[in-house]
Amino acid sequence: MHRIAVVPGSFDPVTLGHLDVIERAARMWDEVHVLVVHNPDKSALLPIAQRVALLDRSIEDAGIAGNIVASWSVGLLVDYCTDIGAHVLVKGIRSQVDVAYETPMAIVNRHLAEVETVFLLPNPANAHVSSSLVRQVASLGGDVSPYVPAAVSELLSSS
C-alpha cells in the first residue's frame, strides 16, 4: 500500500521549523504533499505561487526532495486529500495554543472524510519560530536567516 500524507500550511514564508516537519513526514510516509492553503484569517505577505516556488527550492536545497511534492489549494483540505488518496494530515505543534487551534479542525476533518491528523512536536531549536515572527522581524529590518531557508532569507532581505 502506497501511503500518502499531506502537510498543509500557509507557509508565508516557509521556515526551518516547517522544513523539519516536512523532512520527518517524508521519512514516515511514502509520499508527502506539502500543500500551501489559503487561510482567510491571515493577511498574506507572499502570493501563493511564490510560496510554492520557495517551498520547492527550499526542499531541493535541503536535499529532501525525493518523495515530496509541493502544491497549493484554495478548496477544502479534505477534498484535496480525497483527490490524491491521502488519509493523513501532518501538523507541527509548538505549544498548547497550537493544540487548541488544531484539535477542532482535526476532529472535523476526520468526520468529513476520515482523514486523520498526526501532530509532530518541533525540534527544540525551532520551537519558537513561526512565519508571523519571521514576517515581523523582516519588516523591521532584522536578520531572519537563523529561522528560514536561504531562499527565503535572500528574498526577505532584498525586499
From Swiss-Prot:
Gene from which this protein is expressed: coaD
Residues the record lists as binding ATP: S10, F11, H18, G92, I93, R94, E102, N126, A127, H128, V129, S130, S131, S132
Cofactor(s) essential for the protein: Mg(2+)
Annotated Gene3D superfamilies: HUPs
Subunit structure: Homohexamer.
GO molecular function: ATP binding; pantetheine-phosphate adenylyltransferase activity
EC number: 2.7.7.3
Domain of life per record: Bacteria
InterPro entries for the chain: Cyt_trans-like, PPAT, Rossmann-like_a/b/a_fold
Regions annotated as coiled coil: none
Described purpose of this protein according to its UniProt entry: Reversibly transfers an adenylyl group from ATP to 4'-phosphopantetheine, yielding dephospho-CoA (dPCoA) and pyrophosphate.
Location relative to the cell: Cytoplasm
Pfam families, A to Z: CTP_transf_like
Enzyme class: transferase
Residues flagged as site, Transition state stabilizer: H18
Record's protein name: Phosphopantetheine adenylyltransferase
Pathway: Cofactor biosynthesis; coenzyme A biosynthesis; CoA from (R)-pantothenate: step 4/5
Presence of keyword Manganese: no
Family named by the database record: Belongs to the bacterial CoaD family.
Keywords: ATP-binding, Coenzyme A biosynthesis, Cytoplasm, Magnesium, Nucleotide-binding, Nucleotidyltransferase, Transferase
Enzymatic reactions: (R)-4'-phosphopantetheine + ATP + H(+) = 3'-dephospho-CoA + diphosphate
Biological-process GO terms, alphabetical: coenzyme A biosynthetic process
Entry keyword Transferase: yes
Protein's organism: Leifsonia xyli subsp. xyli (strain CTCB07)
Residues reported in the UniProt entry to bind substrate: S10, K42, L77, K91
GO cellular component entries: cytoplasm
